[in-house]
Regions:
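Short glycine/serine/threonine-rich phosphate/pyrophosphate-binding segments
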Residues: 14-25, 110-118, 143
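Glycine-rich ThDP/TPP pyrophosphate-binding loop and its adjacent helix/strand module
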Residues: 1-36
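Short beta-strand segments
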Residues: 13-15, 39-41, 133-138
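Generic structural signal for well-ordered alpha-helical scaffold segments
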Residues: 1-5, 25, 97, 118-123
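Short glycine/serine/threonine-biased micro-segments
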Residues: 14-17, 21, 58, 102, ...
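Active-site/ligand-binding loops adjacent to catalytic centers
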Residues: 30-109, 147-152
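Phosphate-binding loop/pocket of nucleotide- and phosphate-handling active sites
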Residues: 59, 70, 74, 116-152
Length: 152
């Protein structure tokens, strides 16, 4: 809150169990009732399904939109968010590599996916000048042996 002088217009967060996003959104909405919450979930191509049994997934992330209610956690209900962005695993990998090279930040897949979505949100003309906060929850350490950080 210090970095934004107490004002956040848009919160971008991943759909994991939903607890962090829900709690953060609840607090920020108490400060700004007009807060927009953008939930980020894996693109259908980046989910393990019978149609995609070998999909590279965004680790620790669950879809919240367009899925059976029985699969949602107690906090992962799409009604607390205003929009949803699907991110492909490859987009998360590309973002992680770009940020590592440019900024020296070593992101994991879910952090990179959230950042990828936040950049998309920030590029929209209607969001120019708005304070956008993104929650990044993982680093790249546990992904060193995965395709994400293997040498190309």
């Amino acid at each position: 809150m210090n970095d934004t002088e107490g004002h956040v217009d848009i919160l971008v967060c991943m759909a994991g169990t939903g607890g962090t996003g829900f709690g953060t959104a609840s607090y920020l909405r108490s400060r700004n009732p007009n807060l927009q919450v953008v939930l980020v979930q894996p693109h259908p191509d980046s989910r393990l399904t019978p149609e995609h049994p070998d999909a590279q997934i965004i680790d620790g992330v669950l879809p919240a939109y367009d899925v059976p209610e029985s699969t949602l956690s107690d906090y992962l209900w799409p009604d607390w968010s205003d929009a949803c962005i699907n991110v492909r695993t490859e987009e998360a990998y590309e973002t992680a590599h770009e940020v590592l090279r440019a900024e020296g930040l070593f992101l994991g897949t879910s952090a990179a996916a959230a950042l990828h979505a936040a950049v998309q949100v920030g590029r929209r003309p209607e969001n120019q000048g708005k304070n956008i906060v993104v929650i990044v929850l993982d680093n790249g350490m546990k992904y060193l042996s995965t395709p994400m950080y293997r040498q190309k």
